[in-house]
Amino acid sequence: MAKVCYFTGRKTVSANNRSHAMNKTKRVAKPNLQKVTVLIDGKPKKVWASARALKSGKVERV
């Protein structure tokens, strides 16, 4: 299973670090994903959920 938020679709993205001389190097920005158990179609299932989804109440834990 890929590390993508089941509810919001948030995932790892690539970005650049920029120095004062505007040199660039690649970096990755990772979301704060938590493994949680939720009810999906009446059955408990473990999925990845972003901390933002958990805080906003989009996720109902078992």
Curated annotation (Swiss-Prot):
Protein name: Large ribosomal subunit protein bL28
Lineage of the species this protein comes from: Bacteria, Bacillati, Bacillota, Bacilli, Lactobacillales
GO cellular component, as recorded: ribonucleoprotein complex; ribosome
Keyword Ribosomal protein tagged: yes
Molecular function in Gene Ontology: structural constituent of ribosome
GO terms classed as biological process: translation
Keywords of this entry: Ribonucleoprotein, Ribosomal protein
Family: Belongs to the bacterial ribosomal protein bL28 family.
Superkingdom in the source lineage: Bacteria
Database matches in Pfam families: Ribosomal_L28 (PF00830)
